[in-house]
Design a protein with these regions (language model features):
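ATP-binding N-terminal substructure of ATP-dependent carboxylate-amine bond-forming enzymes
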Residues: 1-77
């Protein structure tokens, strides 16, 4: 069985706990955030510089990465 993938929307300091928890649960973590200085990019397995409000970009990332789920944790858009 292959590793499950989760796309997390946003990589602020408040969201790092969700990224870490997903990794602890065995998920491959994919992150998207338009802020280039977000701390989550250093925790996630893969990072995309894309706005979480850009529905088309988020959809394309999810499709390309073949994620099993999408999580918005402590996001504010």
């Amino acid at each position: 069985m292959s590793q499950k993938k989760i796309l997390l929307l946003g990589g602020s300091a408040q969201q790092v706990i969700a990224i870490k928890t997903a990794k602890e649960l065995g998920y491959y973590t994919v992150l998207c955030d338009y802020l280039s200085d977000n701390p989550g990019q250093y925790v996630a397995d893969k990072y995309y510089n894309a706005s979480t409000t850009d529905v088309e970009a988020v959809y394309q990332i999810a499709k390309d990465e073949q994620v099993d789920g999408i999580l918005a944790y402590a996001s504010d858009p």
